[in-house]
Amino acid sequence: MNQYMLAIDQGTTSSRAILFNQKGEIVHMAQKEFTQYFPQPGWVEHNANEIWGSVLAVIASVLSEAQVKPEQVAGIGITNQRETTVVWEKDTGNPIYNAIVWQSRQTAGICDELKAKGYDPLFRKKTGLLIDAYFSGTKVKWILDHVDGARERAERGELLFGTIDTWLIWKLSGGRVHVTDYSNASRTLMFNIHTLEWDDELLDILGVPKAMLPEVRPSSEVYAKTAPYHFFGVEVPIAGAAGDQQAALFGQACFTEGMAKNTYGTGCFMLMNTGEKAVASKHGLLTTIAWGIDGKVEYALEGSIFVAGSAIQWLRDGLRMIKTAADSETYAEKVESTDGVYVVPAFIGLGTPYWDSEVRGAVFGLTRGTTKEHFIRATLESLAYQTKDVLAVMEADSGISLTTLRVDGGAVKNNFLMQFQSDLLAVPVERPVVNETTALGAAYLAGLAVGYWNSRDDIAAQWQLERRFEPKMDDDKRTMLYDGWKKAVRAAMAFK
């Protein structure tokens, strides 16, 4: 009987289960959406039990639809929406509050207080992160502050904290193990990425009891086996875990220092492998742990772009300029250029390297000759300009010049965008055959732990190129276009 690896990809809007074979090819996939809760403006929450239910449902679906028996699963790898925070009762397994999602801004007030007390440099130095509502630490504090008796119960060891990987491993193992991996721990604002331990000083500042924190383990290791009653009577090794963006870096086989990937989803997340050194950023990048494997930890620099694919959705749903996302490519290619039009899609502010949450979207360079095609092209080009902004500071911080960019995510199907991206960066852009790189990364991490794959070299050799986009633009034009973009961003930031 053939053996397969099962990846659980627990995302922000849906949970997916994907079966991979030995060649790293997708055998079958199942997906289930779950409810988003918005109790107040800017707040985003999930029901952790509903997430768990959705994971069980997709596991059942993928096995039955693919006609794969549970005993044919060699191991399970988990990848997850990062930073999203769950606090639950150790005895009952019941969450004491909804999961607070990474996007949620409900702890912005706590962050402002911490920054006002001058704690930002301390957190930055120890965790590689900024004090921001994005990360888990202030979310745990919020739950402990707002649920009656929670802090006292946490101190007595009655409550457990976890990011979604921890919650799912705990549930799948029947409550036997309370663990996270290095990559997820590095997103909590409580983990020292240099000593590789929960940091007592930071926990003290946040008022989070150490007793509730999971044990931090490598990203590729057998943590536990599934409780038979959760996996059709079978005990399967749960053998790998990583946050979604780090898993994508692994799935793209970016194993050597200086290799980078960009995921074009709702937003963009760009990660560059910096090897065994944690590179401190001077330009608003995050320093994060890529993974812990083979007895060592490797680091990455990360840049975040808030609006990417959602700008294409805006053209479709908000402005009704296109009927499908694919139409954007057709219209963009009908014109030679944007005719001087720039769209700055700062709908919710700008991320790396600007970190300005007040700035709003703007359009510049409109004339009587501007058409729908120019506007659509300018919107697509904005994704590439924002990517160049991030890569420019990555190169400056790391001292590494990028030689190629590997890409994944929904928007990479757009050939116009990929060619323009290559032109603007002056490096080749590589699109892989398997676009589900996040799930593939989780499968690879678990597969290495159970011997399904032998080494990272085997995995790197499996990485298959679907199409390579080579730069065709001359330097003068590239400089002129990018200078125009920088001018547009400055103008947008001045208008508040």
UniProtKB/Swiss-Prot annotation:
Domain of life: Bacteria
Thermal behavior of activity: Thermostable.
Keywords, alphabetical: ATP-binding, Glycerol metabolism, Kinase, Nucleotide-binding, Phosphoprotein, Transferase
SUPFAM superfamilies assigned to the protein according to its UniProt record, in alphabetical order: Actin-like ATPase domain
Coiled-coil intervals, chain numbering: none
Positions that bind ADP: T12, R16, T266, G309, G410, N414
Single GO MF descriptor: glycerol kinase activity
Listed InterPro entries: ATPase_NBD, Carb_kinase_FGGY, Carb_kinase_FGGY_CS, FGGY_C, FGGY_N, Glycerol_kin
Pathway: Polyol metabolism; glycerol degradation via glycerol kinase pathway; sn-glycerol 3-phosphate from glycerol: step 1/1
Gene3D superfamilies, alphabetized: 3.30.420.40
A Gene Ontology cellular-component term: cytosol
Gene Ontology biological process terms in this record: glycerol catabolic process; glycerol metabolic process; glycerol-3-phosphate metabolic process
Protein name: Glycerol kinase
Organism, as annotated: Thermus thermophilus
